[in-house]
UniProtKB/Swiss-Prot annotation:
InterPro entries according to UniProt: Poxvirus_F12L (IPR005005), RNaseH-like_sf (IPR012337)
The family this protein is said to belong to: Belongs to the orthopoxvirus OPG056 family.
GO cellular component: host cell; host cell endosome; membrane; virion membrane
Keywords: Early protein, Host endosome, Host-virus interaction, Late protein, Membrane, Microtubular outwards viral transport, Viral release from host cell, Virion, Virulence
Highest classification ranks of the organism: Viruses, Varidnaviria, Bamfordvirae, Nucleocytoviricota, Pokkesviricetes
Protein name: Protein OPG056
Primary role: Plays a role in intracellular enveloped virus (IEV) transport to the cell surface through microtubule transport. Together with protein OPG064, forms a complex that interacts with host KLC2 (kinesin light chain isoform 2) to engage the kinesin-1 complex and thereby promote IEV trafficking.
Record-level GO BP terms: microtubule-dependent intracellular transport of viral material towards cell periphery
SUPFAM superfamilies: Ribonuclease H-like
Chief location: virion
Record note on quaternary structure: Interacts with protein OPG164. Interacts with protein OPG064.
Subcellular location: Virion membrane; Host endosome
Upregulation: Expressed in the early phase of the viral replicative cycle.
Length: 635
């Protein structure tokens, strides 16, 4: 089986081979090394990220393991509380999702009954979901005639003499709990079908859930330390045996990984006496060091590890940066060379444990020398980029593209006086993320040629992006940028699926779409009903001029970095869900998808096999490569 995976990795440059590789990754984690000997753990959740950063056909596959199970169990995705909007019908009133729907109903009745309104104004009513407690309060205020009665009890003739009573239909709704509907007209009432929605858009639009990008850029830190984790191969999978730091100590333990990690954390704690935040800088640490430690992270150690952040029980924070994501694809030695430090080799990862023990003294020395070189290169690069991309600082970002684009957007915002905002809590972020679709939409599995947008940068730099805080609207306004919760119905005739949905048997579903995607889907014949939207009244104008100025500045500093950065920006939008320019990525991806669809409109649908926001697979027999296709490149 190892031989089979090794062959697949060497030829993983087409969709079919990569899909076969994914099948293995459902059962195994691939242990691989690059040319410099740096370990890479490849699993189902990170293969796409790895392929966006490097050519995986050049990696050496060392082995397979089933032991790193923590990496195969994805962390739970935060879920917003399901939401039902308020419905005020002539026959009934259904309050929006609330912990106390009965209180909402009595307040609604007070709009029509002045004596209830007066009682609510004079006397407070405690929040409660108990009908008997509400009735007790009404009775104590001389308002017993408005007592709450359940619909089923009323139909049993028990309360017919109370003509003014508040009749409520009681129900339990999954993932929401108890809900009540006030029945205004018994003659015309039938229990309504209420849309249970994944988001409360009105809540998400609240001002306090949005912050200006510029306000998050002015951050400082005290200390930077380079770090590397080394792993050996054992019968139970890869095992960390050494953690090296510079400036700092080297920790070695072949007998207990728990003790190795605890000693490292104790040292971190000791050096944080004068600061609450330090920066650890690794190289390819997101691909090996951090996931390997995550597998062995001890319970109840006083620290939690969340992706690239360590947080202690007393609030101290360690940001673990991966300098590789700022290298534009350079090897460690090339990165050090291009940023002015002496390139040094490092110990190989994923060697046998017995070999690591035998050579440990030389490994410790070699690791320290390599980390010193990385430290000097990183300090030089961070100083240079923080001048060119002020006020952006490297440690605030997870990769160079994110830092570069944020600096461009911030500069345009300053010049125009219109700033971009970003969501500050999990639910509002999740709503924005839900509008981003990076998946391939499969039409058929015929043999195809792959085409990619020639320059993503050209497309996205000439478009407009949201400025300011969003407003809640029931339906978006044509010509304005907005993101809406939508009920989507697919066309009944044969069609190319434009809106991604993972259930082929469902013809109507609820999803989040940008105004750009709504326009594209409508052109494709979809029926879309908007169920609430975040809308922006102002736009940041096109970024092209500022983008070109920024590229020129970096080019003057380092041509290799600039050329590689430009290539990455042209080929990809590497979406990052923790980015403060999340809104930019959302609309940039939608603009690219609209462009892909405009090309698909010129091609007979029988020739289209699959597509994503930046790529299009066309049947090999298709020969009519028109002028529009000149904006794509064949891979």
């Amino acid at each position: 089986m190892l031989n089979r995976v090794q062959i697949l990795m060497k030829t993983a440059n087409n969709y079919e081979t990569i899909e076969i590789l994914r099948n293995y990754l459902r059962l195994y984690i691939i242990l691989a090394r690059n040319e410099e000997g740096h370990g890479i753990l490849i699993y189902d959740d990170n293969i796409d990220s790895i392929m966006s950063m490097m050519n995986i056909t050049r990696l050496e596959v060392i082995g397979l393991t089933t032991h790193c199970t923590k990496l195969r169990s994805s962390p739970p995705i935060p879920m917003s509380r399901l939401f039902m909007d308020e419905i005020d019908h002539e026959s009934y009133y259904s309050p929006k999702t609330s912990d106390y729907p009965l209180i909402d109903i009595i307040r609604k009745r007070s709009h029509e009954q002045g004596d209830i309104a007066l009682a609510l104004k004079r006397y407070c009513i405690e929040n409660t979901d108990s009908i008997s407690e509400i009735n007790e309060w009404l009775s104590s205020k001389g308002l017993a005639c408005y007592r709450f009665v359940k619909f089923n009890d009323y139909r049993k003739q028990m309360y017919r003499k109370f003509s003014k009573c508040t009749i409520v239909d009681s129900m339990i709704i999954g993932h929401i709990g108890h809900h009540y509907i006030w029945i205004k007209n018994l003659e015309t009432y039938t229990r309504p079908e209420i849309d249970v929605l994944p988001f409360d858009i009105k809540y998400i639009s609240r001002d306090e859930l949005w912050a200006q990008i510029s306000s998050s850029l002015d951050q400082t830190h005290i200390k930077t330390i380079t770090v590397s984790v080394y792993g050996a191969i054992t019968d139970n999978g890869p095992m960390p045996y050494m953690i090296s730091t510079y400036p700092g100590n080297t920790f070695v333990n072949f007998n207990s990984v728990k003790d190795l990690i605890l000693n490292f954390l104790d040292w971190i704690k000791d050096i944080m006496t004068s600061t609450r935040t330090i920066i650890l800088v690794g190289y390819m640490s997101n691909l090996f060091d951090i996931p390997l430690l995550t597998v062995y992270w001890p319970n109840n150690c006083g620290w939690k590890i969340y992706n690239n952040i360590l947080i202690s029980s007393d609030g101290a924070r360690v940001i673990w940066m991966d300098a590789y994501k700022f290298s534009c694809g350079l090897s460690l030695q090339d990165y050090c060379y291009h940023w002015g430090s002496k390139p040094e080799s490092r110990p190989f990862d994923l060697i046998k444990k017995i070999d690591a023990k035998r050579n440990i003294k030389s490994w410790v020395k070699e690791s320290m020398t390599s980390l010193k070189s990385l430290y000097e290169a990183f300090e030089t690069q961070s100083g240079a980029l923080e001048v060119l991309m002020s006020p952006c600082r490297m440690f605030s970002f997870s990769r160079i593209e994110d830092m570069f684009l944020t600096s461009v957007i911030n500069r345009v915002s300053k010049n125009t006086g219109m700033g971009m905002y970003y969501p500050t809590n999990d639910i509002s972020s999740l709503f924005i993320e839900s509008s981003i679709c990076l998946d391939y939409i499969i039409v058929n599995n015929q043999k195809s040629n792959k085409y990619r947008i020639k320059s993503v940068l050209d497309i996205i730099s000439s478009k407009q992006y949201p400025a300011g805080r969003p407003n809640y609207v029931k339906n978006g306004t044509k010509g304005k940028l907005y993101i809406a919760l939508c009920k989507v119905t697919v066309p009944t005739n044969d069609h190319i699926p434009v809106v991604y949905h993972d259930d082929d048997n469902t013809t109507t579903f609820i999803t989040v779409l940008t105004s750009v995607d709504i326009e594209t889907a409508t052109r494709a014949g979809y029926s879309i009903v908007e169920l609430g939207a975040l809308q922006w009244d102002d736009n940041i104008p096109e970024l092209k001029d500022c983008l070109l100025d920024s590229i020129k500045m970096i080019y003057d500093l380092n041509t290799v970095t600039t050329n590689n950065l430009l290539e990455q920006l042209i080929e990809n939008i590497n979406f990052n869900n923790s980015s403060i320019i999340l809104l930019f990525y959302t609309f940039a991806i939608s603009y690219c998808r609209a462009f892909i669809y405009s090309i698909m409109e010129t091609i007979d649908p029988v020739y289209i096999s699959q597509f994503s926001y930046k790529e299009l697979y066309i049947r090999s027999s298709y020969k009519d490569i028109n002028e529009v296709m000149s904006q794509m490149v064949k891979l």
